[in-house]
Amino acid sequence: MRALLLIISFCLVAVLQAQDSSFLAFNNGNFSGKWFLKALVSEDDIPINKVSPMLILVLNNGDIELSITHMIYDQCLEVTTILEKTDVPGQYLAFEGKTHLQVQLSSVKGHYMLYCDGEIEGMRFLMTQLIGRDPQENLEALEEFKVFTQIKGLVAENLVILEQMEKCEPESFYELPSRPSE
């Protein structure tokens, strides 16, 4: 379970940097702040039903700090992590190079699509995610995301639309310790 949550959190971070015409031009002012995970598709069933807004901070060295809280089985799980940039614009590596993250700019303003694949704690995964600056559902962005998902080899029928929550208030709360990149 912890590995799955880390996968989701690391994939979210991938949205934050890209520099050529096929990706989003990076600008610290555009990315630090609040983002919303609107939808995701994975090969495996994801037990997340609610998410808080992501708080993102682009660090001076280009690395990114991300904090998000997921509601899983009526419990809150807070994840804060640092993701290191690579030499390839819009791509990141995590978990000692075993996890690859890629950003795709959506044609819908304020939306980005993420493709994540790799291995975390022995668990292989493949996932796409749709994030945006506001919590409202955008059907145009969602339709584009479904096409993106199919191009990346996933089945759009596995789409999960996530419920947004401002603050997690479950019966219990669990915080994962920060896990620095190496």
From Swiss-Prot:
It is found in: Secreted. Residues 1-18 form the signal peptide. Disulfide bonds join C76-C168. Keywords: Disulfide bond, Glycoprotein, Pheromone-binding, Secreted, Signal, Transport. Transport of lipophilic molecules, possible pheromone-carrier. Glycans are attached at N30. GO terms for cellular component: extracellular region. The keyword ATP-binding does not apply. Pfam families: Lipocalin. This is Vomeronasal secretory protein 1. It comes from Mus musculus. Belongs to the calycin superfamily. Lipocalin family.
